[in-house]
C-alpha cells in the first residue's frame, strides 16, 4: 500500500481519519502535517479567490480579460495545417474559470503550447503571460472545454485587479481566515522535512520519483505563483478549505469568504453543451472551478446528486456533499494519477451512510 492520508468530516466533526505509511525504500512516516503538492487542487482555491473579486465588482464574468492583460488580445488560434487565425472573440473571465479559453497545457499538448519545462523555468506570472503570448491557442474561446493553464492566467488577473501579489491575496483573503498555515507556493526548510516523496508506478511496480519528475521546485524566492498547479498543502489545511465550502462560504471565525449565492453560481453548469467535459464524464457537469454531479444514475455509482470537488495530478482529491454536510479529502503522492482511489473511497463512504 502506498503512503496516504484521508479525512472525512460530517457536521463539522471529523468522523474518519486515516494515515498509512508504506514500507517502500525512500518513503517517510506520514501524518496529517505531511506536506503534499496539491497540483490541480489549487484551482478551486484560485477560483474562489477570483469570485471574491467578482463579488466586489472588480470584473463581470463576460468581460474580456485583455482589458487588463493586453497580450491576450494578440493571441493566435490554431486553424489546421500548421496555420493560425486571429481571435474571433476575446477570452473572458468566464472562459478562464470554466476552461474554455483555448489555452491548453496538459494532456500532451505542451509540445504545442510551450513545454511544461519552459513553464517550470519561469520566475513570475508576468513571464507566463509573455510565454503564452507567442503560442497559438487550441481553439476559439468559448467553443470547447480544454483543460490547461487558464487558472494560472486567472492568477495573474487577480494580481492586477487586487493590486497585490497573488500569494499575498490568497494569504489575506483565504488562508489566514481559515487557519491554513501550511498552504503556500513554496517550501520552507521545515516543510521540506515533511514533504511527501513522489512514487511512480510502472508496469505494476512502484519506484521512487526523481527530482525531474517532481517537476516544480517550490523555491521560496520564486514569484511563479501558479494558481492552477503550484500550491502545497496538508490534509488538515485543505480540510479547512473544504469545511468553508460545506458551510456555504463561511469561515470558523464567522467571516464570509464568499457569499452562498456566489457558491451557487460556481456550482451551476457553465459549459451548457460546450463539448469537451461532460461527454467524457457521464453524469457530471463543470461550473466555475469545480466539477459537480447532476445525474447519479448516469454516473452509475452511489454518490448523491450535488456533490462537487476536484483532484490533483499526484493522486490527491476531495469532494463536498452539501446535502449530507460532509467533505472528504484524500492525499497520496503517486504518478500516474490513480482515479480508482477516489471512486473506491467515495463508494465506501456512501455504503456506510446507508
State where each predicted segment sits.
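Short, conserved catalytic-motif segment at the N-terminal edge
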Residues: 1-38, 58-60, 74-80, 216, ...
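Short, surface-exposed loop or secondary-structure junction motifs
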Residues: 75-305
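A short acidic/small-residue loop/turn micro-motif
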Residues: 21-25, 67, 334-337
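Generic C-terminus detector
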Residues: 335-354
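Short clusters of small/polar residues that mark proteolytic maturation junctions
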Residues: 19-21, 211, 332
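Extracellular/periplasmic catalytic domains that process cell-envelope and extracellular macromolecules
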Residues: 28-29, 60, 84-90, 139, ...
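Active-site SXXK
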Residues: 12, 35-65, 151-159, 238-241, ...
Amino acid at each position: 500500500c502506498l503512503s496516504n492520508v484521508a479525512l472525512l468530516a460530517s457536521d463539522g466533526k471529523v468522523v474518519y481519519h486515516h494515515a498509512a505509511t508504506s514500507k517502500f525504500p525512500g518513503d517517510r512516516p506520514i501524518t496529517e502535517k505531511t506536506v503534499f503538492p496539491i497540483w490541480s487542487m489549487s484551482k478551486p482555491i484560485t477560483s474562489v479567490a477570483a469570485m471574491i473579486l467578482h463579488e466586489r465588482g472588480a470584473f463581470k464574468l463576460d468581460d474580456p480579460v485583455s482589458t487588463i492583460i493586453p497580450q491576450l488580445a494578440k493571441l493566435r488560434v490554431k486553424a489546421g495545417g500548421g496555420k493560425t487565425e486571429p481571435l474571433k472573440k476575446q477570452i473572458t473571465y468566464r472562459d478562464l474559470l470554466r476552461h474554455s479559453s483555448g489555452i491548453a497545457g496538459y494532456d500532451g499538448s505542451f509540445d504545442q503550447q510551450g513545454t511544461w519545462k519552459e513553464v517550470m523555468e519561469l520566475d513570475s506570472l508576468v513571464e507566463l503571460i509573455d510565454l503564452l503570448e507567442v503560442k497559438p491557442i487550441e481553439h476559439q474561446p468559448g467553443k470547447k472545454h480544454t483543460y490547461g493553464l487558464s487558472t494560472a492566467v486567472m492568477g495573474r488577473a487577480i494580481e492586477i485587479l487586487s493590486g497585490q501579489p497573488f500569494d499575498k491575496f490568497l494569504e489575506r483573503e483565504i488562508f489566514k481566515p481559515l487557519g491554513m498555515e501550511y498552504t503556500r507556493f513554496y517550501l520552507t526548510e521545515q516543510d521540506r522535512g515533511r514533504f511527501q516523496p513522489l512514487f511512480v508506478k510502472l508496469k505494476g511496480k512502484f519506484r521512487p520519483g526523481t527530482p525531474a519528475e517532481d517537476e516544480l521546485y517550490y523555491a521560496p524566492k520564486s514569484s511563479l505563483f501558479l494558481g492552477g498547479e503550484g500550491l502545497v498543502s496538508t490534509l488538515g489545511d485543505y480540510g479547512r478549505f473544504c469545511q468553508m465550502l460545506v458551510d456555504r462560504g463561511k469561515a470558523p471565525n464567522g467571516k464570509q469568504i464568499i457569499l452562498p449565492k456566489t457558491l451557487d453560481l460556481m456550482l451551476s453548469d457553465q459549459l451548457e453543451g460546450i463539448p469537451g467535459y461532460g461527454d467524457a464524464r457521464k453524469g457530471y457537469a463543470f461550473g466555475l472551478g469545480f466539477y459537480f454531479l447532476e445525474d447519479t444514475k448516469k454516473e452509475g455509482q452511489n454518490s448523491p446528486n450535488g456533490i462537487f470537488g476536484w483532484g490533483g495530478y499526484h493522486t490527491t482529491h476531495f469532494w463536498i456533499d452539501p446535502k449530507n454536510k460532509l467533505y472528504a479529502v484524500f492525499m497520496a503522492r503517486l504518478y500516474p494519477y490513480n482515479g480508482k482511489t477516489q471512486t473506491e473511497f467515495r463508494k465506501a463512504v456512501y455504503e456506510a451512510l446507508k
